Regions:
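Charged DNA-binding/catalytic regions of mobile-element recombinases
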Residues: 1-244
């Protein structure tokens, strides 16, 4: 079977993001007898270049407010060994020609799956509420025994309105230490991947275009197709199915 044409097709299927290690795994699952050295050579010949990850740079959150601060319960966990043990919540901004669009997500720390997301033109508490509601519905409308919801100390997560929603589903809140965003590194790493592989590769004309495109990237590609080396080169959904 000729393999020379296959790397470009597999590369395009990765949204032109895979380097040779993940592309090798992709081709092997398509029953191509290739090794990393050969795939690297074929990529050079075709002029294909993946999107290398950027070094994680934490950004602190303004936490000077009167909201309730939960203790950092995540720090006391020896390890995360199952899904629905820890969810991590965070907010980022996406640039468009019409101004900033804000994205809130809830991520399963075990599988890296984005369970919930919401978009807004403002940083109102409704944004993080909507993302958590989607995550809860993704898991059948309820939390799990002992589930932690970890976030930074942002005013949205500390508000009384937000705190009522985890409490209603028996989800225990946890918050990062002041000025220490490494506590929420999984969510920050997701945002870095999103911006590098998707957001910064095009210019969105308005909020609606960005919403549609980012939703499709998260749900159709990131959750279900994108391979993660930390997950044994599986997608988050495949990793959950294997470890359910």
């Amino acid at each position: 079977m000729a393999i020379t044409p296959r790397p470009p097709a597999a590369f395009d299927a990765s949204r032109q993001s895979y380097g040779y290690p993940r592309l090798t795994v992709e081709l092997r699952e398509q029953h191509e007898p290739v090794g990393k050295v050969r795939v690297a050579r074929l990529m050079r010949e075709e002029g294909l270049r993946g999107r290398p990850p950027r070094r994680y740079r934490p950004q602190t959150t303004q936490s000077d407010h009167d909201g309730a601060i939960a203790p950092n319960r995540l720090a006391a966990l020896p390890a995360i060994t199952a899904r629905d043990q820890v969810w991590q919540a965070d907010i980022t901004y996406l640039p468009t020609a019409a101004g900033w669009l804000y994205l809130a997500v809830v991520i399963d720390a075990f599988s890296k799956r984005v369970l919930g997301w919401a978009f807004s033109a403002s940083l109102a508490t409704d944004l993080v509420l909507a993302a958590l509601e989607v995550a809860v519905q993704c898991r059948g409308g309820q939390g799990a025994p002992g589930l932690l919801l970890h976030s930074d100390r942002g005013v949205q997560y500390a508000s009384a309105r937000f705190r009522a929603l985890p409490a209603a589903h028996d989800i225990t809140p946890s918050m990062s230490r002041r000025g220490n965003c490494y506590d929420n590194a999984r969510a920050e790493a997701f945002f870095s991947t999103l911006k590098l592989e998707h957001t910064y590769r095009r210019r969105f004309a308005d909020h609606e275009e960005d919403r549609r495109s980012t939703f499709e990237w998260i749900e159709a590609f990131y959750n279900r197709r994108r391979r993660h080396s930390a997950l044994g080169n599986q997608s988050p959904v495949d990793f959950e199915n294997q470890n359910n």
